[in-house]
């Protein structure tokens, strides 16, 4: 039997079972749990390699083969960290296993044929496309920025640079819903829109759901009173749509207890649950312990650093149309920015009490930094708090597989479950839409190499188009063919409500993208949040703002230096 060293094998085919990989320049290390390929039967494309006619490529018709195979990829997902070939067909994930030619190779579960394209995954990490559930659609250029960061699904609301959209993620009314659904046809991104949920009568809310909204947004700037909360959730229950809420910072219509009471145990997604982005001051953070609350953070407070507090005050004044000359507006802003609750937010993420991370794009958050900020938070917590239970600390330094699974779930499967789109996206699983992101380990979470939408490359880091090879400078992110023409419409989804799909909004509005209805939003609960389902009893001292969870005081120092930062963005 011919043997090969681990180093040589990894250099040729990528890491295998037991090998460890560092993520970017963080302190996070993952270990390959399983290898679905077969030693000695690996497939690889190129001159003198395996995927050639009569060798690793079969003679079978396209109907029996995958359209694309990603070879020898290292999959990082909530369900595992494994090495495998990935087969894509018809825009979806067809198989995860062993690719090749079953006529001459054993154990083949992914058939390669003359109709198969190859993407080399050796030495690459593959993740599911990110899902950002807190989007202010202030400008369409956000969409490209998000896509190039590895986000493939955006959920939120807005109409452009209108004052209401600067502050709230709302696409209000049927007319705007139709226009925005038509506008997003131009972009290679899965998108779902939220309507305005602030009303005390059901009819004006219901008509927005029927017009295409996948959910509703309650925002204090429109008046998030207990009556509005109750009415909005009643419509959501009737239509199987989700509600996202930004609660009452000033406690005008009641304190956090009144808001929890208005929920009446019904499922709701709480935005920026720590409170710096808005919500009952100073103790909105305590809702993360409720069984019906699905809590998320926005990325400006991720993670807590020495700069976090200073930048927040200026951002807040702009985003919520506040006047620095008015004392009450200054007091409003200062009530939201609390170092103690921001520090506690880091720890609550690490312990799995906060389930999701999103951006709050151009409205205090950065649309292209959801993934970066998530992994910076994971790194900071690993450095300050050590290994999580379940992650070993052996003579080789151990690995962080469980922590990595916990954090990747925050921007993939958990937002998908929350908003009723997990049947389509949110993980690398057979049958799901093939929205995949390929990363070099050194650039993981920062700069993806390829972004696939619906099984086709939509964006990539590409060199000079006039060069003799693809790699010469300047290399920057450019849209690829899945972002063009009719392929764009076939490669991306528009999410709508079941009521809108039944009302045939696609034909009525002249939409070309594939429409997919959200479902299961009213039965999801905190216990369904993958790796992030802890429900602590949280209290906040009204004078010191100190946060205690299940009797434990939550405190940590701000970071003075972070990975995944300046060294990646010099050019």
Swiss-Prot record:
Where along the chain is the active site annotated?
A: 320
What cellular component terms from Gene Ontology apply here?
Answer: cytoplasm
**Cross-referenced Pfam families, in alphabetical order?**
Amidohydro_1, Urease_alpha
What does the UniProt entry say about where the protein is found? Cytoplasm
Q: Cofactor stoichiometry and binding?
A: Binds 2 nickel ions per subunit.
SUPFAM superfamilies in the cross-refs: Composite domain of metallo-dependent hydrolases, Metallo-dependent hydrolases
InterPro entries per UniProt: Amidohydro-rel, Metal-dep_hydrolase_composite, Metal_Hydrolase, Urease_alpha_N_dom, Urease_alpha_subunit, Urease_AS, Urease_asu, Urease_asu_c
Residues bound to Ni(2+) 2 are: 217, 246, 272
Specify whether Zinc is a keyword of the entry.
no
Q: In which pathway does it act?
A: Nitrogen metabolism; urea degradation; CO(2) and NH(3) from urea (urease route): step 1/1
The family annotation for this protein states: Belongs to the metallo-dependent hydrolases superfamily. Urease alpha subunit family.
NCBIfam families (UniProt xref):
PRK13206.1, PRK13207.1, urease_alph
Name the UniProt record assigns to this protein: Urease subunit alpha
What organism does the UniProt record list as the source? Cupriavidus pinatubonensis (strain JMP 134 / LMG 1197)
Give the gene name.
ureC
């Amino acid at each position: 039997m011919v043997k090969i060293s681990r180093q040589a094998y990894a250099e040729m085919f990528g890491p295998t079972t037991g090998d460890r990989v560092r993520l970017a320049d963080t302190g996070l290390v993952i270990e390959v749990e399983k290898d679905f390929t077969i030693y000695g039967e690996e497939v690889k494309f190129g001159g003198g390699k395996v995927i050639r006619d009569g060798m690793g490529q079969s003679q079978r018709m396209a109907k029996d083969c995958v359209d694309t195979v990603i070879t020898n990829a290292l999959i990082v997902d909530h369900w595992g960290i494994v090495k495998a070939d990935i087969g894509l067909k018809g825009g979806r994930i067809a198989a995860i296993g062993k690719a090749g030619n079953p006529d001459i190779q054993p154990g083949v579960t992914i058939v390669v044929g003359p109709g198969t394209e190859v993407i080399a995954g050796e030495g690459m990490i593959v993740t599911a496309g990110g899902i950002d559930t807190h989007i202010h659609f202030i400008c369409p250029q956000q969409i490209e920025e998000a896509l190039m960061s590895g986000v493939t699904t955006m959920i939120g609301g807005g109409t452009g640079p209108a004052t209401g959209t600067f502050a709230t993620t709302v696409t209000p009314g049927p007319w705007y819903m139709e226009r925005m659904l038509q506008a997003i046809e131009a972009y290679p991104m899965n998108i779902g829109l939220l309507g305005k949920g602030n009303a005390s009568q059901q009819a004006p809310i219901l008509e927005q759901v029927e017009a295409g909204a996948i959910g509703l947004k309650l925002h204090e700037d429109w008046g998030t009173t207990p009556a509005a909360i109750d009415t909005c959730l009643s419509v959501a229950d009737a239509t199987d749509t989700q509600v996202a809420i930004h609660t009452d910072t000033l406690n005008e219509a009641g304190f956090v207890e009144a808001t929890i009471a208005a929920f009446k145990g019904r499922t709701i997604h709480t935005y920026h649950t720590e409170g710096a982005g808005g919500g009952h001051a100073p103790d909105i953070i305590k809702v993360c312990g409720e069984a019906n609350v699905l809590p998320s953070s926005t990325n400006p407070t991720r993670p807590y650093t020495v700069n976090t507090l200073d930048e927040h005050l200026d951002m807040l004044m702009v985003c919520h149309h506040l006047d620095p000359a008015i004392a009450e507006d200054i007091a409003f802003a200062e009530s939201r920015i609390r170092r103690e609750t921001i520090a506690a937010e880091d720890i609550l993420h690490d312990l799995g009490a906060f389930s999701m991370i999103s951006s709050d794009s151009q409205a205090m958050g950065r649309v292209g930094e959801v993934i970066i900020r998530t992994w910076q938070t994971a790194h900071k917590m690993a450095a300050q708090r050590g290994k999580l239970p379940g992650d070993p600390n052996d003579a080789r330094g151990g690995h962080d597989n469980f922590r990595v699974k916990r954090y990747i779930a925050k921007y993939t499967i958990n937002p998908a479950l929350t908003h009723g789109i997990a049947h389509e996206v949110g993980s690398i699983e057979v049958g799901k839409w093939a929205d995949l992101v390929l990363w070099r380990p050194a650039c993981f979470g920062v700069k993806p190499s390829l972004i696939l939408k619906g099984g086709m490359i939509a964006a990539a880091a590409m060199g000079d188009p006039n060069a003799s090879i693809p790699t010469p400078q300047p290399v920057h992110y450019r849209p690829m063919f899945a972002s063009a023409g009719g392929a764009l419409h076939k490669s991306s989804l528009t999410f709508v409500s079941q009521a809108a799909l039944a009302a045939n909004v696609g034909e009525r509005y002249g939409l070309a993208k594939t429409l997919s209805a959200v479902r299961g939003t009213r039965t999801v609960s905190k216990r369904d949040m993958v790796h992030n389902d802890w429900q602590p009893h949280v209290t906040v001292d009204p004078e010191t703002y100190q946060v205690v969870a299940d009797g434990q005081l939550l405190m940590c120092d701000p970071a003075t230096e972070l990975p995944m930062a300046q060294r990646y963005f010099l050019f």
